[in-house]
């Protein structure tokens, strides 16, 4: 059987961090290396995703073209992957002729097959910039937690948002308030695929169970999918001058277009009726639905393509038990890690720390402990003492009469063969943690055998040869099985053993071994922790400076008196104050405006006790568009001033009746 292994396309808006490495790239490389080790035909396809709003935003901030950002980070990402010893047979980019042509062919075929249609939608439009605003071009206040949020996501509370849900939205280019207009977008009729996709998922025996369950839940409520965007940077929609394909319809097509870079070979892996092949997609958990539902839907809509056999979804990675954040620099970049430690140590730690489908944490202390007390004290100990003792006593691996081996020798060799079979099954099931545990257990058995045989005390040279031959067999199996996980260290071991990467022990002359596995020192860990805190502090300083600029009004536009006159400001009096459920900041306030009572949601909790507010006369904006905060409708806004942690309601210096207008 042929194997096609793909990794999620890295987005060219920044370099890789440890989360990317753990969920996707390291496990995919281990799987590919193992299949190749077993003599199976496999190609590993990877590349970068180069389109979409975040790239255009970065380019605009830096005053360069989007292609400049793409080129920079495509090269940086490839360098990061090389440093992790993640290798590919083909590595492409979506901003290339072959990809754009392939993506447009897919789109046209979907349209020809009746799966693309036009539909009017509501979208923010900026009059000042004369453009429709994609989700990342709009920012405002999260309606759930009152944090600053983007049009698609609130980083404070983690919720997915629609741009039109934002409170006080503004265009990120000019800071003016956008209006909602109707525009025509193109939709993929994904809802028509419900039965087909359900059958596909239920009849995919190699699909991991947690992926199946997630996909089936989504398929139950399948909706059509908006697949166009009003931006210029992307794959142009055929026959449309002002919209491009949404990245999540065109980026997965990269798996096909990048395989095409290998020539006609691509057909054997992707087209139906071209032989037996297996497709495995390695991805992060956050894009499971895109690969298990949307992408198969596209392939079904095109027709004639093989379907993915497995979507291998890696869990989230936290850092020191906190969610990673690139904007806050609470992250460890691959480049920074590799400058200080072997990539093999990272590959080992991530695969042994937790099953791939589970979320896990990267802690510098745990990393040190795992490497020193597990990898080095068990595997490193057995490999080093076997090589050193054998080289010193014999200069080469002993050749013995296998019929003369004792039961205890045969027991360890039998353990090697059992481990080989178990590791094979586990890796093919994408169970990398348990596969690695089997190798560790074999090394433990080897250490126990070495210690029990006490070769330093054996006087009979033939018996000593049998013992060290048995240790060398175990060593060869460990190196063979470990090679997919730790290619650098095992290559060094093979060099000292003067052996090939197979299971045969040839009796070759040994090279004088050096220490291969070196411990991670306390000084190393202290330095990395300190670097992390410095980077985070630097990001906090930048964030504080940005907040001060906003507070000082540096971003505000000049307005005329007529504009100000449109704001209905009146004196109100607070009658009742209640806490808003699930919110740490919000009160639900009932205010008297003279001719009516209003419900207002305000973030004064923590600054004022509820009883302090009752009876206060305040200034209220009365003609603000109603908005929901944490599910509670707010029909106005109380005015307050803020400086760092101090919040103060605006008050009158003379008593005026409620309802009085402010000019």
Swiss-Prot record:
The job of this chain, per UniProt, is described as: Is required not only for elongation of protein synthesis but also for the initiation of all mRNA translation through initiator tRNA(fMet) aminoacylation.
- Please list the residue ranges annotated as the tRNA-binding domain: 563-663
* Keywords noted in UniProt: Aminoacyl-tRNA synthetase, ATP-binding, Cytoplasm, Ligase, Metal-binding, Nucleotide-binding, Protein biosynthesis, RNA-binding, tRNA-binding, Zinc
UniProt xrefs under HAMAP family: Met_tRNA_synth_type1
State the InterPro entries in the record. Answer: Anticodon_Met (IPR041872), Met-tRNA-synth_bsu_C (IPR004495), Met-tRNA_ligase_1 (IPR023458), Met-tRNA_synth (IPR014758), Methionyl/Leucyl_tRNA_Synth (IPR015413), MetRS_core (IPR033911), MetRS_Zn (IPR029038), NA-bd_OB-fold (IPR012340)
Q: Tell me, how does this one assemble?
A: Homodimer.
**Protein localization:** Cytoplasm
Coiled coil stretches, renumbered: none
Name assigned to this protein:
Methionine--tRNA ligase
Q: Which family does it belong to?
A: Belongs to the class-I aminoacyl-tRNA synthetase family. MetG type 1 subfamily.
Q: Which Pfam families match?
A: Anticodon_3 (PF19303), tRNA-synt_1g (PF09334), tRNA_bind (PF01588)
Q: Where does Zn(2+) bind?
A: 142, 145, 154, 157
| Principal localisation | cytoplasm
Q: Which gene encodes it?
A: metG
